[in-house]
């Protein structure tokens, strides 16, 4: 394997596919059924298809990609999806004009023409507990690039674009590219953790753990916010209006919800967090 710090002369196009997947969770406490309904409507409006399109357009700009096509959709009763096809090379004027047109998505024959290209997608999932006041908003984001451009450049921007309490990230490199001598290269950059690409303020704000499979070029990082300021988690209510015992109970419910999402399992009813 060549040193990743030095540039390798490739035979043809860089065929490596680099994919970065996010699951971002925003947790909130809305006491009444009316407040929970209002929260879901609020979050659905804040992260509608138009706003998500702007976020993903910024991501394309950050990683140095060219936009080929945009498809977006708001769903009823809630949720939104946006898909952007991107390429590494500059696009023609005709393709650039087509990218400005918002439509239901490319037809199958159009997709076949871009199988060697890259994409950015986002889907949102607002939901709430049926009995308690905890509500959770989830955004799933995938940034997949083919060539030298790296989705890792957009890491910090995406984390800061959402009110992220828990973040689950997967980064993988697939395929191979050849150098001029015909030797295969299965990765073209140094990495031992996704955390290498996190800003210092992000590392300080979150508790993080890694599960990496280096020989498979597969990297997994989970993050959960360290500090819980109750005022920032109440919807339609102020912490100052609550009794101390009620504040403690709400904080317990919020921390439990975050811990279960972070661990990926339900805790026992009497298990402390």
Curated annotation (Swiss-Prot):
Catalytic residues (UniProt):
118 (schiff-base intermediate with substrate), 123 (proton acceptor), 146 (proton donor)
Q: Which GO terms describe its molecular function?
A: adenosylmethionine decarboxylase activity
Enumerate the Gene Ontology biological process terms: spermidine biosynthetic process
Q: Which reaction does it catalyse?
A: S-adenosyl-L-methionine + H(+) = S-adenosyl 3-(methylsulfanyl)propylamine + CO2
- Describe how it is modified after translation: Is synthesized initially as an inactive proenzyme. Formation of the active enzyme involves a self-maturation process in which the active site pyruvoyl group is generated from an internal serine residue via an autocatalytic post-translational modification. Two non-identical subunits are generated from the proenzyme in this reaction, and the pyruvate is formed at the N-terminus of the alpha chain, which is derived from the carboxyl end of the proenzyme.
> Does the record's keyword annotation contain S-adenosyl-L-methionine?
yes
Q: Where is this site: Cleavage (non-hydrolytic)?
A: 117-118
> What are the EC numbers?
4.1.1.50
Pathway noted in the entry: Amine and polyamine biosynthesis; S-adenosylmethioninamine biosynthesis; S-adenosylmethioninamine from S-adenosyl-L-methionine: step 1/1
Q: Any idea which UniProt keywords this protein has?
A: Autocatalytic cleavage, Decarboxylase, Lyase, Polyamine biosynthesis, Pyruvate, S-adenosyl-L-methionine, Schiff base, Spermidine biosynthesis, Zymogen
Return the GO cellular component terms, semicolon-separated. cytosol
Residues recorded as bearing Pyruvic acid (Ser) in the entry: 118
Q: Which cofactor does it need?
A: pyruvate
Record's cofactor remark? Binds 1 pyruvoyl group covalently per subunit.
> What is the stated purpose of this protein?
Catalyzes the decarboxylation of S-adenosylmethionine to S-adenosylmethioninamine (dcAdoMet), the propylamine donor required for the synthesis of the polyamines spermine and spermidine from the diamine putrescine.
Q: Which HAMAP family match?
A: AdoMetDC_2
Q: How does it assemble?
A: Heterooctamer of four alpha and four beta chains arranged as a tetramer of alpha/beta heterodimers.
Family according to the record: Belongs to the prokaryotic AdoMetDC family. Type 2 subfamily.
> What is the protein's name according to its record?
S-adenosylmethionine decarboxylase proenzyme
Q: What is the lineage of its organism?
A: Bacteria, Pseudomonadati, Pseudomonadota, Gammaproteobacteria, Chromatiales
């Amino acid at each position: 394997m060549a040193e990743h710090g030095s540039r390798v002369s490739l035979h043809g196009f860089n065929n490596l596919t680099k994919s970065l997947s996010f699951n971002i969770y925003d947790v909130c406490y809305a006491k009444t059924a009316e407040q929970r309904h209002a929260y879901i409507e609020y979050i659905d409006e804040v992260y509608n298809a138009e706003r998500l399109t702007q976020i993903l357009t910024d991501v394309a700009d950050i990683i140095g990609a060219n936009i080929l096509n945009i498809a977006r959709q708001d769903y009823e009763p809630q949720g939104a999806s946006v898909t952007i096809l991107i390429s590494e090379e500059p696009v023609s004027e005709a393709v650039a004009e087509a990218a400005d047109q918002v439509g239901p998505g490319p037809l199958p024959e159009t997709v076949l023409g871009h199988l060697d290209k890259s994409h950015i997608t986002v889907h949102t999932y607002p939901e709430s507990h049926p009995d308690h006041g905890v509500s959770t908003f989830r955004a799933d984001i995938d940034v997949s690039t083919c060539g030298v451009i790296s989705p890792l450049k957009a890491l910090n921007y995406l984390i800061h674009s959402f009110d992220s309490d828990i973040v689950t990230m997967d980064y993988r490199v697939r395929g191979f590219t050849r150098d001029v001598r015909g030797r295969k290269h299965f990765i073209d950059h140094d990495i031992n953790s996704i955390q290498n690409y996190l800003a210092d303020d992000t590392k300080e704000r979150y508790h993080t753990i890694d599960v990496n499979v280096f020989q498979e070029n597969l990297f997994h990082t989970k993050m959960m916010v360290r500090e819980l300021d109750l005022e920032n988690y109440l919807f339609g209510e102020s912490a100052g209006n609550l009794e101390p015992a009620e504040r403690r109970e709400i904080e317990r419910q919020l921390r439990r919800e975050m811990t279960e999402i972070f661990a990926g399992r339900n805790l026992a009813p009497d298990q402390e967090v």
